């Protein structure tokens, strides 16, 4: 095995010009020039599908422990100080995306059970009808708000949070929680997330979702805060991913007359194939992280044990060695092993919900918006997630 060249011809830089609007040209350059990059002694970025897929499916590789990570990263604000983030530091121990072993399996099973029982087709239909009613008379609006409102209504039905917990508050809470998980997070972001979690706590009481989770994990005797923490994960995992995937898919479909007509004419099976292609193309979760338990070789590079492997799912999804014409949306793409929701035992919790939502409501939403013009999108300055902040929509005059 050879050692990593510490001077790659193209070095990953999320602050390169245009990255937050469209990261794919830069990711392509990284993948083609240096598909495995070492950023520090024990940290590597992986851009090629082969390497990303190999790592993400290895059941022996672990995710980062969120509690330990936060304490190590910001010891003062997570040390229990009154001016710090004691609540955030305490409850993240039940966030399944940062758990390993049996506890990960238990939390994941409980959440999946609750989502399966409560995220019904009837709840989706009701959310769609309420959304169309709320936006029908608007001549101009934000597409991300339209898609977010649909998810807000659906999640309120599923999670059972109070009716007076407003859409803007849910959107802000979800955004703060995902900001906290990003690269290069300032202390102010953690403090804002702590405050938002505390303020939102009264809106999440006992619900059918909480009852199912408690019942499935009865031997752990979850506290109210721990149950609330699990509900928060279900909230932001579903809200951020589903809203972004939905909005970005509509952004691609509506200006394309052929694609619009394809969606409206497609049967259920063809729509499912298209949904997978849209998920591959958009890839809202751009990165995930693993730690290898033993030394490994990736792309001919020696990687020491317990290295931080930062897997670029977005780059892997555009790898031409796996996907024909990867930078295009091919509605009937048959070979599509995309990694948008990860893979293996840490498959994204919000993935199943996003798939069902897209398959169920994509066509009626396209029909609702087919006479609208879509303006240039503005994207959030996040690295872990590639999500739109604002997509202007204006109805054409009759």
Regions found by a protein language model. Name each.
Residues 1-147, 152-167, 175-183:
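Active-site substrate-recognition loop segments, prototypically the cytochrome P450 B′-helix/B-C loop
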Residues 27, 355-398:
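Cytochrome P450 proximal C-terminal region
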Residues 159, 169-225:
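Cytochrome P450 catalytic core segment centered on helix I
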Residues 205, 218, 265-301:
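Conserved cytochrome P450 K-helix E-x-x-R motif and the immediately C-terminal K′/meander segment
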Residues 230-235, 239-263, 351-369:
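Cytochrome P450 catalytic-core helices
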Residues 314-336, 375:
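Conserved cytochrome P450 K-helix/beta-meander segment immediately N-terminal to the heme-binding cysteine loop
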């Amino acid at each position: 095995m050879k050692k990593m060249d510490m001077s790659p011809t193209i070095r990953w830089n999320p602050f390169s010009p245009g990255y937050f609007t469209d990261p794919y040209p830069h990711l392509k350059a990284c993948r083609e020039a240096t598909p495995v990059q070492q950023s520090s002694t024990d940290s590597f970025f992986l851009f090629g599908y082969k390497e990303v897929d190999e790592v993400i499916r290895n059941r022996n590789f672990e995710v980062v422990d969120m509690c330990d990570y936060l304490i190590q990263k910001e010891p003062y604000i997570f040390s229990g100080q009154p001016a710090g983030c004691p609540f955030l530091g305490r409850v993240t121990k039940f966030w399944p995306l940062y758990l390993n072993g049996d506890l990960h399996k238990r939390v994941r099973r409980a959440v999946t059970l609750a989502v399966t029982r409560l995220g019904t087709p009837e709840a989706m239909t009701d959310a769609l009808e309420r959304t169309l009613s709320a936006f029908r008379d608007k001549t101009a609006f934000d597409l991300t708000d339209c898609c977010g409102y649909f998810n807000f209504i659906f999640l309120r039905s599923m999670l059972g949070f109070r009716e007076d917990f407003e859409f803007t508050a849910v959107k802000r809470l979800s955004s703060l929680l995902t900001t906290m998980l990003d690269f290069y997070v300032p202390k102010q972001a953690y403090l804002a997330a702590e405050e938002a979690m505390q303020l939102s706590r009264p809106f999440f009481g006992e619900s059918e979702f909480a009852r199912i989770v408690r019942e499935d994990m009865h031997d752990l005797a979850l506290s109210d805060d721990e149950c609330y923490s699990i509900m928060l994960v279900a909230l932001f995992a579903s809200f951020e991913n589903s809203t972004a995937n939905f909005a970005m898919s509509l952004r691609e479909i509506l200006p394309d007359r052929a694609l619009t007509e394809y969606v409206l004419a497609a049967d259920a099976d063809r729509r499912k194939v298209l949904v997978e292609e849209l998920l591959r193309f958009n890839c809202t979760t751009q990165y995930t992280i693993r730690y290898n338990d033993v030394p490994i070789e990736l792309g001919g590079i020696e990687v020491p044990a317990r290295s931080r492997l930062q897997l670029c799912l977005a780059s892997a999804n555009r790898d031409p060695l796996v996907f024909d014409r990867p930078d295009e949306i091919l509605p009937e793409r048959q070979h599509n092993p995309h990694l948008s929701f990860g893979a293996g035992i840490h498959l994204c919790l919000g993935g199943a919900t996003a798939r069902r939502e897209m398959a169920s409501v994509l066509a009626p939403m396209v029909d609702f918006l087919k006479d609208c013009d879509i303006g240039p999108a503005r994207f959030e300055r996040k690295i872990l997630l590639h999500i739109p902040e604002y997509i202007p929509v204006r109805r054409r005059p009759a």
